[in-house]
Curated annotation (Swiss-Prot):
Residues carrying the site annotation Important for catalytic activity: 331
The keyword Ubl conjugation is annotated on this UniProt entry: no
Organism this protein belongs to: Brucella suis biovar 1 (strain 1330)
EC annotation from Swiss-Prot or TrEMBL: 4.2.1.2
Misc note: There are 2 substrate-binding sites: the catalytic A site, and the non-catalytic B site that may play a role in the transfer of substrate or product between the active site and the solvent. Alternatively, the B site may bind allosteric effectors.
Domain of life: Bacteria
Enzyme class: lyase
Protein name: Fumarate hydratase class II
Presence of the UniProt keyword Metal-binding in the record: no
């Protein structure tokens, strides 16, 4: 039987594993919430470490916390930030809606680790108490939403933005490489007027640049922190100036520019800032879905599809059809986008549940937002590295489809009129003849004028 030690809380004593830093409230949560396997996301755990370190430093600065105790709390909290204590955060997302159990998990782990650093006895709560010292000037009600904002901002800046830039650059390379390849455009999935393959890829690249702009705009409110509102937004038990000092400390720790929220009542009860930001993630997912679909459809074949693009062959595609290779990176990215669309609904419903002074769907908001950031980041890097970088144009197929298209007739419309041009296209389609043959047979245009007007290279920009 594994060794245990006895920890206590207001409900009395309880045994916890001797080699774990968590205490009584974490252990009770493990026993009371045996629901699923979705652990609290590690970026959120690390953000709680930031909260506890920043609170300790601010309490020291304001003369509330003994500097000796505060400094060792900061050391233990830094270990949480660095991921050294990840194994000591076992709780699932499905717990109290305020995130109190996870906040106490952080308080207990940091308390016991700090006691250990001072040579004391774990579980004694002496000389560092999880509530009185680690949680000083705080409530779960302001600490947990603050951690959500910190984790969201840090993950976005350090993970999502680099991944988005990586894919954008990969598309830009192809845009330049394909700039002189003229192909048939398509609207409503039907033939339209010509574009260059580079122009098509420029649309993908620009979509991601606009997505980055929307993300940056919506992230601005995420940099506003609830800390200092304590239980209901009034700031009870937090000293004057704690909120501003705390935000400055978080900025110093993370290297990002955080500020205290001007209205703590809104910050505790509403999660509009995070919902709005996830809306930008949702929009990015929609763009990625479109890009992935376009590329896999343009690469369909190899003998019976559009076949304008050759996609990298990364792995066998079928357990029954020998030699089959599938557009797996595009499929993975569209599944990620689908998950993000679902997360958007979950975050929307959760953010609407701010009853009176507190929203009590905080953990599920954190889980879905951070999952979306992680999945989008990973899939963009994977799609860039294993798909986009290896895309090659099938120029012969592109030329064949361009020359067969009846929509080149659009170039004749200014000269012979829309109705006449439409009749020529319909006749060619009905008879299985070429556009050129029917145009000349109509007597409406000479061979010389047809060859002058119907030139794909003159149809890809204003003339």
């Amino acid at each position: 039987m594994a060794a245990t030690r006895t920890e206590t809380d207001t409900f009395g004593p309880i045994d916890v594993p001797a080699d774990r830093y968590w205490g009584a409230q974490t252990q009770r949560s493990l026993q009371n919430f045996r629901i699923g396997g979705e652990r609290m996301p590690l970026p959120l755990v690390h953000a709680l470490g930031v909260v506890k370190r920043a609170a300790a430093e601010t309490n020291i600065a304001l003369g509330k916390l003994d500097p000796v105790l505060g400094q060792v709390i900061a050391v233990a909290a830094s270990e949480v930030i660095e991921g050294k204590l990840d194994d000591h955060f076992p709780l699932v997302v499905w717990q109290t809606g305020s995130g109190t159990q996870s906040n106490m998990n952080a308080n207990e782990v940091i308390s016991n680790r700090a006691i250990e650093l001072l040579g004391g006895e774990m579980g004694s709560k002496k000389p560092i108490h999880p509530n009185d010292h680690v949680n000083m000037s705080q409530s779960s009600n302001d600490s947990f939403p603050t951690a959500i904002h910190i984790a969201t901002a840090v993950e976005t800046v350090n993970r999502l933005y680099p991944a988005l830039e990586h894919l954008t650059k990969a598309l830009k390379v192809k845009e330049e490489a394909f700039k002189d390849i003229i192909k048939i455009g398509r609207t409503h999935t039907q033939d339209a007027t010509p574009v260059t393959l580079g122009q098509e890829f420029s649309g993908y690249r620009a979509a991601l640049e606009y997505a980055r702009h929307r993300l940056e705009q919506s992230l601005a409110d995420v940099f506003l922190l609830a800390q200092g509102g304590t239980a209901v937004g009034t700031g009870l038990n937090a000293p004057v100036g704690f909120d501003k000092g705390f935000a400055e400390a978080v900025s110093e720790i993370t290297g990002l520019s955080f500020k205290t929220a001007p209205n703590k009542f809104e910050a505790l009860a509403s999660h509009g800032a995070v919902l709005n930001f996830h809306g930008s993630l949702n929009a990015l997912a929609a763009d990625l879905f479109k890009i992935a679909n376009d590329i896999r459809f343009l690469g369909s074949g190899p003998r019976s599809g559009l076949g304008e693009l050759s996609l990298p062959e990364n792995e066998p595609g079928s357990s029954i059809m020998p030699g089959k290779v599938n557009p797996t990176q595009a499929e993975a990215m569209t599944m990620v986008a689908t998950q993000v669309f679902g997360n958007q609904t979950a975050v929307t419903v959760a953010a609407s549940q701010g009853h009176f002074e507190l929203n009590v769907f905080k953990p599920v908001i954190a889980y879905n937002v951070l999952q979306s950031i992680r999945l989008l980041s990973d899939t963009m890097v994977s799609f860039a590295d294993h798909c986009v970088e290896g895309i090659e144009p099938n120029t012969a197929r592109i030329k064949e489809l361009l020359e067969r298209s009846l929509m080149l007739v659009t170039a004749l419309a200014p000269a012979i009129g829309y109705d006449n041009a439409a009749r020529i296209a319909k006749t060619a389609h009905k008879n299985g003849t070429t556009l050129r043959e029917e145009a000349l047979a109509s007597g409406l245009v000479s061979e010389e004028d047809y060859d002058r007007l119907v030139r794909a290279e003159r149809m890809i920009a204003p003339q």
